[in-house]
Structure formats: structure tokens, C-alpha cells
Amino acid sequence: TKGMERTVLQIIFPFLEKIGILWLTGHINPAQEHLVTNLIRQKLIVAIDTVHTSIKVDRSILFFLPEGEHHELGLLFMHYLLKSRGLQTIYLGANVPVKDLAYIVNLKNPDIVYSHLTATTSAFQFEKFLNQVSQQITGTPVILSGLLTQHYKKTPPTGIEFKKSLQEVIEHLASV
């Protein structure tokens, strides 16, 4: 467990930052970035599927990415971290409409809902998304992190909380 965690934090995430810079500066093709990202994604999924822990925590967390968001690596890593710490996990994946998210939240009744927003499409309206989530998911705390939350200057709507760093997210979700 700790080996995967260290590998992602010390090697993979810094490597992905460099890949992002190469992509932004036109030094690699988007297909190359997709290839690397999908190889890492596969490894994270295998790690999630094979994680074994003697710790059992009687709390559940639901992971999702909103419509227009397809960058799963941060969310998959958080899924891995919390599953390895004994939390029950429900992973919906990428591109989930808010109405579908609300349906699953009502069906599964998780203790917390979490999403990490990396790079949504240009059509994504963050404020509209926040309001929809706040209106449709009541009684279950929603935690959001990622670049969009760091640049948002207003107070999030009721029921939604922003976390600014990976460490903040881990500490908060592990203590819920």
C-alpha cells in the first residue's frame, strides 16, 4: 500500500506535471499524453482492485467526476488511498450528470461525496454545477478539490466544501 502511495506522490504526479508542460508547449502530441495517462490509470485500477487491508471503517465515500470532466487520475488515486485506509468506496467515474449522481446518492446513502476537478471542458459552468449539486444532494456533505476550486473566489453553496490540497483532502476524508 505505501509503495503505491509513494510511487504516485513522488514519481507519477511530478512526471504528469512535466507531461502537462510538454503538452502545453507543443512538445508532445495529445495522443502521447493519453497513452501515458491511460497506462497509469490501468495501474491505479489494478491497485484499487487488489488492495487488502485489515482496517474496516464503517463509513462510505462516493467518487465521481461531473459531466465534461474526464481526468480521472486524481480521483482514482484518492479512491485507492481511502480504500486502503478501510473506507467503503463507491466509484462512479467520469462524466456523471448531476441528476444521475443524486439518484445514486439517494440509493446508496454514502457518508460523503467527493470529486476532484482537473480540467473540464470550456462549456462547463462551475457555478451552475455547484448550485445543481447543492440543490439535488442534500443531507450528504460534498467535498470538492482541484484547480477549479482553487480559483473560485466566492463561498461555496450550502453542503459543499472545498479542499485546497491533497493533504487537506486526505486528512478531511480520513477523519469523517
Where are these regions (language model features)?
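Long amphipathic alpha-helical segments
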Residues: 1-52
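Conserved mid-sequence domains
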Residues: 34-141
